[in-house]
């Protein structure tokens, strides 16, 4: 697997678990980082909220479906050039989310 991944101004350094945007460090919550990495690993695939809850939060967690939405919104705020009009983390109506970076 690659040591880093770049989309737009965002660079994810997997070895350091570090995310930068235009050269500035972006502070992600641990679960936001895990979610971002999972989206990158599965780029181009539409992932349901239930699938993301299972894979990113794990079997033991009992978060609500809104948990995924809140974390996606957090990633968009921190990483998207225009969070209200996402370019990289897309909502696929009634199916889930897709990363296209």
Language model features with spans:
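Positively charged, aromatic-enriched patches within helix-turn-helix-type DNA-binding elements
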Residues: 18, 23-95
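Conserved catalytic Walker-motif region of ABC-type ATPase nucleotide-binding domains
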Residues: 7, 12-14, 99-101
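Flexible, glycine-biased helix-capping/connector loops in cytosolic signal-transduction modules
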Residues: 1-3, 15, 29
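Basic, amphipathic DNA-recognition helix from helix-turn-helix-like DNA-binding domains
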Residues: 1-6, 78
